[in-house]
Amino acid sequence: LETVCKLPRNKQELFFMFPKADFPLTINQLKNTIKDRFDSTVVLFNNEVVGFANFYEVRESQYCAIGNVIVSPCFRNRGVGTFLINAMEDIGKKKYNVSELHLSCFDANTSGLLLYTKLGYKPYEIEKYINKENEVSALIELKKCCDSK
């Protein structure tokens, strides 16, 4: 958990990963969130945690919603994000027999939006999100249909 807490380098990266958290991310904040989530998953490279994600909602035989996605800054644009999202998709399909996967991405997270659309996720809704500083963002909801076999 300590290593995952160090992945977001600044307030904006933490906001993209975990909008309700305070920077810097602490073990207690992370523990309190993941206790209510499913299948927290890390990507390891040479025994170093380089990526993290989980499901914040699971509806068996329907959909899983992927959240808390982050990749170590040193490993961005090197396939780790793709590997991580594919791993979460596999868990959703095999463990929960889902036909859709959902995720959310803020409008300012260009890298995330480009990755998710490259992986086949399509926007279906945009929500107004107001952060702790009362700043407004657009939270883009995306989904991907999949063969659950």
Where are these regions (language model features)?
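Extended, folded domain segments that form the structural surfaces/walls around functional sites
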Residues: 68, 96, 103
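Acetyl-CoA-dependent GNAT
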Residues: 3-76, 85-87, 91, 145-147
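Residue-level preference for beta-strand/loop junctions
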Residues: 35, 62-63, 97, 136-138
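Serine/threonine-rich low-complexity intrinsically disordered regions
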Residues: 19, 26, 78, 122-125, ...
